[in-house]
Amino acid sequence: MQQRITINLNTDSKTTDKTTILEYCRSHGIAGIETPCGGKGTCGKCKVTVAKPYYKDVLACQTKICDGMEIIVGRKESTGTKEDSMVVLTNGENVSEKFNEHVNRNVEDTLAACDIGTTTVVCYLIDKETGQIISTRSGANPQRSFGADVLSRIDAAARADDNDKANGGLQMMQTQIVSLLNGWISEMLTECGRTKVSRFSVAGNTVMCHLLMGISPEKLGKAPFMPDEYFGREFNPLDIGLENCQTMIIFPAVSGFVGGDITAGMMETVNCNELTLYLDIGTNGEMALGIGDRYVCCATAA
C-alpha cells in the first residue's frame, strides 16, 4: 500500500536538511522501505518516489530531505496482487472454533512463546493447563528497515546518534520489536478473553535477543564474536516496555552465533538416544549434530 508523506522541517524537531529519506521514515515509524544492505546504498532496494519539488525515483538511503518535500513510499496496489509479497506460514491449525473454550481463565493459566527471527517473527498464546496453542500471530520483523541480515543490524546498532540517543539504531530497533510484540499479545489476550500472560518465553538468535533487550550487539561483529549476554534467565518485561506479561525468560545462547533459537529446539532431543541432526534454516542458519547431552554446533548465513 502506498503512502504519500509531506515533510515539514519547521514543525519537526527530529529532522534537519541533512537527514536522509530513510532516516526520516525510520524515526517516524513509516514502514514500506526495504534495506537489505542496511542503508549503505549498495543494494538499490530502497527506492521511493519524490513527488515534490521534483518528480523522480530515488534511493531513500542516499537522498536528503528538504522542507515541503513530498515522497511516495510503498508498492502500488494492483488487482490480484497481495499488498506484501512476504507471507509467513504457520502450522495451519484452525483454532478459531476453540476460543470460547478458554474465556475467563486467570493469568496463571496463560503462557506465551515467541521466536524472533531475523526476517520473520512468530508469537503463540498457550493454555497452560492443556498445552494447547489458542492463538497465533506471525509477520515480518520490522527491523528489516535496518538491513536484511544480522551483520547489517549490528552495524546499525553501533551507529547511535550521539545527539539523540532515543533515535539511535539500537534504541529504534528495540522499540520496533517491542511495539510489535505488545500489539500482538494485546490482540491475542483480547481474542481469547484473557487479561495477562504469566510467563513469556523468547527464542531467537543472539543478535535478535540483544536488540530486544536494548543491549549493543557490537561485539558480535568482530572477533572473537563474544556476546555481552548469554541470556538463559528471567527478565522483568517492564524493563523493556513489554506489557501484559508477568515474567519473561530468554532461551540461552551457546556461543556468539549459536543462539537461543537452536537451544530451544535442541531441548526436544536431549532425551533421544539416537544420533540427531537439528537444522534451523533461516536468514541466520544453525546446525547441531549429537546424541543425548553432547552436541556439536555451527552457524552461518543461510
Model regions: which residues?
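Conserved phosphate-binding catalytic cores of ATP/NTP-utilizing and phosphoryl-transfer enzymes
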Residues: G92-D109, T247-T276
